[in-house]
């Protein structure tokens, strides 16, 4: 049985020091790779790293060192520049310290005592200014101490399997006007194999990085002259998007959704009415037109509400399903922008459903079925998280209970695995978050299904029921992909750029061996485009055959057709299928027909 390193009580994790101090009992947390255990291991590893840095750079001052999804990090400052190469030196010092088997102990101080103790450390003063408590805690190991809430391991000797992964800059407290600190990230596990597996995945993730592949494959770019976080879709990337949009549009049509479009900018008065102005203003962009303030939309919901309000509504019309590939703008700090995953302009596969309370379950059932079709088409495993009523919320108990019960029932009827985030819903209604797992077993938050009782009330939406009474509808916000930008980034990394045939930006590439085959290759390309609907390209560069094939391979085109004199004469094509890793021959007409069938057999 592995060593006990903490206690879980009322969903909170306590280390042994704190549990003993507060007299807390609960479920034991063993030294393993459980989520609770890793939270303790990685927090202690952050302190181990800080101790090593303090020994190597005595002038070092530390801000915060939390556990995050990708491990842990510490923000700090020193007088000298630290590079990637220095991480190995810091790591070696960490291993040396860990072997000293220092007990990790906790000291509780009054605010006054803590302020006196760290009076000459400006970063610790900054940390304390953010803590409202009158009692503060310090953790010590050897001659190192740091202000911290915990939880921590009982001894440094338990820290054996860790790796420092990257170095970056970070503004103090995330404030772009504050000083820049150094941030070092790391990872830690309870055993050697888990660390080895993680590092393999990390290397694989670097190869699959959508920013790298996007540039290599000519999918998208960014231009500082235009502005950070504003993606430019190149022809091949736009083709990829079009292929996804085409499939999605057909599926939406079949499921009874109507296309709508709202304006890009709306008067600030309407954002005040919706609540965005008071709750989301810092994430919005504004402009003045004719002395009137307008807000560039960060969400599509208000436009769809105005579509609903464009005429009187009856219960006979409900549910109404409106969709839009809506371009939205949200202000993100430059430090958090990351390729297509985090941008300032993006397009949502957004839909809003206006329905009666009694229709919530059937509508959610349909959305879950839609989600299943999309995820299966791309080979994604997915799970869902149901977030329930928070302490601060609007609406009466009965509506909340009915809405939450409808979401639960829909999930269970569809045999979908889900977690419950108690109290994690929006103030205006419960929600389901869609989380997908990619080929590297990383989890990504994509779409969401949100029940909204707030906006229908704010905008006084109504429909006439069967008794000729005006009733407020329920509004369901629904996005399955989340945004096209984010989803394309995830797809690129999931497939490593090897997109399946049905969405590949170039589906067929024709490589004539010489000048004599060019004319036939051009005719064949046009036939493929017009008769199969596939994107076909012609490699007509004056290069050797082997180089042409290498270029096509680098572009990760699914089907490569090499055309020589024999193929021109016989009209039987030599095909290389990169996805199936096979080579075969097919008559020209049969190839085009097969291509059309393969592309057409996928639907959402």
From Swiss-Prot:
General function of this protein: Catalyzes the attachment of threonine to tRNA(Thr) in a two-step reaction: L-threonine is first activated by ATP to form Thr-AMP and then transferred to the acceptor end of tRNA(Thr). Also edits incorrectly charged L-seryl-tRNA(Thr).
Pfam families named in the record: HGTP_anticodon (PF03129), tRNA-synt_2b (PF00587), tRNA_SAD (PF07973)
Cofactor(s) the protein requires to work: Zn(2+)
Name recorded for this polypeptide: Threonine--tRNA ligase
Chemical reaction(s) catalysed: tRNA(Thr) + L-threonine + ATP = L-threonyl-tRNA(Thr) + AMP + diphosphate + H(+)
Gene name of the record: thrS
Any one GO MF annotation of this record: ATP binding
Organism: Helicobacter hepaticus (strain ATCC 51449 / 3B1)
Leading EC class: ligase
Cofactor-binding details, from the entry: Binds 1 zinc ion per subunit.
GO BP, sorted A to Z: threonyl-tRNA aminoacylation
Keywords assigned: Aminoacyl-tRNA synthetase, ATP-binding, Cytoplasm, Ligase, Metal-binding, Nucleotide-binding, Protein biosynthesis, RNA-binding, tRNA-binding, Zinc
């Amino acid at each position: 049985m592995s060593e006990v390193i903490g206690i879980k009580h009322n969903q909170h994790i306590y280390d042994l020091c704190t549990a003993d101090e507060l007299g807390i009992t609960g479920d034991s947390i063993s030294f393993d790779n459980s989520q609770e255990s890793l939270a303790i291991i990685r927090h202690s590893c952050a302190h181990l790293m800080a101790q090593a840095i303090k020994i190597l750079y005595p002038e070092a001052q530390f801000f915060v060192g939390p556990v995050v999804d990708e491990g842990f990090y510490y923000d700090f400052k020193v007088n000298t520049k630290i590079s990637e190469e220095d991480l190995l030196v810091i790591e070696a010092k960490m291993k040396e310290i860990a072997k000293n088997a220092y007990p990790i102990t906790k000291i509780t101080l009054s605010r006054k005592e803590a302020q006196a103790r760290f009076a000459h450390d400006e970063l610790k003063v900054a940390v304390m200014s953010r803590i409202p408590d009158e009692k503060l805690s310090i953790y010590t190991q050897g001659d190192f101490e740091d202000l911290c809430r915990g939880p921590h391991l009982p001894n440094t000797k338990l820290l054996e399997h860790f790796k420092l992964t990257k170095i970056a800059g970070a503004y103090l407290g995330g404030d772009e006007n504050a000083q820049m600190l150094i941030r070092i990230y790391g990872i830690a596990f309870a055993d050697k194999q888990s660390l080895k597996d993680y590092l393999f995945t990390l290397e694989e993730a670097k190869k699959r990085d959508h920013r790298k592949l996007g540039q290599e494959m000519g999918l998208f770019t960014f231009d500082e002259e235009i502005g950070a976080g504003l993606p430019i879709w190149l022809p091949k990337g736009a083709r990829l998007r079009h292929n996804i949009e085409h499939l999605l549009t057909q599926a939406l049509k079949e499921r009874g959704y109507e296309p709508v479009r709202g304006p890009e900018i709306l008067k600030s008065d309407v954002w005040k009415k919706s609540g965005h102005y008071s709750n989301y203003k810092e994430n919005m962009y504004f402009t003045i037109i004719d002395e009137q303030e307008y807000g560039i939309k960060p969400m599509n919901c208000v436009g769809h509400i105005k579509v609903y309000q464009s005429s009187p509504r009856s219960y006979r019309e409900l549910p109404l399903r409106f969709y839009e590939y809506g371009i939205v703008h949200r202000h993100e700090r430059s430090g958090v922008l990351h390729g297509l995953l985090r941008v300032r302009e993006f397009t949502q596969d957004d839909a809003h459903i206006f329905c009666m309370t009694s229709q919530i379950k059937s509508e959610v059932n349909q959305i879950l079925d839609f989600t299943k079709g999309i995820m299966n088409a791309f080979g994604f495993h997915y799970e869902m998280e149901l977030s329930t009523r928070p302490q601060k919320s609007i609406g009466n108990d009965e509506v909340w209970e009915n809405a939450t019960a409808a979401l639960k029932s829909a999930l269970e009827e569809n045999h979908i695995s889900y977690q419950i985030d108690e109290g994690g819903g929006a103030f205006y209604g419960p929600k389901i978050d869609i989380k997908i797992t990619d080929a590297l077993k990383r989890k990504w938050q994509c779409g969401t299904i949100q029940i909204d009782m707030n906006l229908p009330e704010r905008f006084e939406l109504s429909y006439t029921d069967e008794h000729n009474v005006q009733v407020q509808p329920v509004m369901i916000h629904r996005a399955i992909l989340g945004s096209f930008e984010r989803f394309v980034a995830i797809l690129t990394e999931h497939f490593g750029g090897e997109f399946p045939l049905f969405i590949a930006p170039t589906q067929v590439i024709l490589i004539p061996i010489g000048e004599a085959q060019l004319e036939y290759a051009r005719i064949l390309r046009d036939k493929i485009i017009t008769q199969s609907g596939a994107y076909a390209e012609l490699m007509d560069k004056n290069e050797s055959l082997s180089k042409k094939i290498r270029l096509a391979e680098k572009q990760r085109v699914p089907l490569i057709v090499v055309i020589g004199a024999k193929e021109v004469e016989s009209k039987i094509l030599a095909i290389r299928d990169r996805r199936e890793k096979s080579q075969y021959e097919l008559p020209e007409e049969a190839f085009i027909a097969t291509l059309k069938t393969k592309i057409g057999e996928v639907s959402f």
